[in-house]
Amino acid sequence: MTIVPKGFQFAVAAAGFKRADRNDLGLIVSQGEAAAAGVFTKNLFQAAPVLVCKELLGERPLARALLVNSGQANACTGAEGLANCRATLELAAKAAGVAPNDVLPTSTGVIGAQLKMDKWAAAAPLLAANLGQASAMDVAKAMMTTDSFPKLSAKAVALPGGEVRVLGMCKGAGMICPNMATMLGFILCDADVEPQAWQEILSFAADRSFNALTVDGDTSTNDTVLALANGASRVSAKDAKSLKLLRAAVTEICQELSYRIVQDAEGGTKVAHITVRGAKNNAQAELAARAIGNSPLVKTALFGCDPNWGRIVAALGRSGADFAPEAVVLTIGGILVFEKGQPSPEDLDALLAPSMRHQDVEIVLDLCAGRGVFTLLASDLTKRYVEINADYRT
């Protein structure tokens, strides 16, 4: 049974945005005012709900409800799209019994189409009737687009003042690169925490999870992770020790969700754990890891269980990271593959074959140039990925 923080209710409805036979609208409502935090896409084309969320959080870092629809991105929809987004806040607020500026909206789906406001108007009363009847799992399912399974993670955390609960849910399977691409995530907590500290916790966790994965190198217009902490547990998280424990818990949940996103990559069969260490700094390590994780040649080698280490080294060499090639050490699955500018003299194909057949493949590069380190989760690239995205709108 999923651990659910105190003071939250859930609702879902089938609005028919994409298909008539599935829930595609979700609502999460806090019983009281909650500290609210958000992290968003860095794409310059930002969807209407992203712009509205940023505006609302900029005015006051507090909220009562989170709203999500799947099937319609409401991105690149101009002034009409913004007006429609604000209209959905009115509808959701009425369903939740809160003020419109207490609702933070999110959307995912096809870019460029206006929201079907007639369907929104018809579905809002269904949300109201379902509030408190649905579960967190129901909302996680309603968020899905090309995902093959819902993604939830939760845990109880013992703080000095007592136990609090943290629940995370997300959707995402394609167009995933840095900054939560086509990825929506919600983090719920019942600790009593100040809004600024809550934002710092979310930003810290996102940098070590949702911003450290890649499926296909594309960054969406709608990336959003929102977090609410409503204090319903009556346990304070305002001292340094409590904040550190809470930050660790939120980070762990976000990392678990990130792993599940890559695990569920469209058509994916592998999760590559790419660690670059010994870089001049962390930024250089990230640059190198992303070049490898986003390389189509590396990804297709992973899919084919091909221990083609040359593709990894070639991607590293064009990454822009500063290092001496002769100093690089590469291991795959713990097996030494490359050092001193040349491959290991062992029969690498035979040695690496078992590791390459695993779902999780560990790739570690030491640049021997400093103390920078970065770990990236990356998927492979398969025929099924091409089929899913070729047929996405048909």
Where are these regions (language model features)?
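A structural signal for small-residue-enriched, beta-sheet-centric alpha/beta enzyme cores
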Residues: 1-90, 94-394
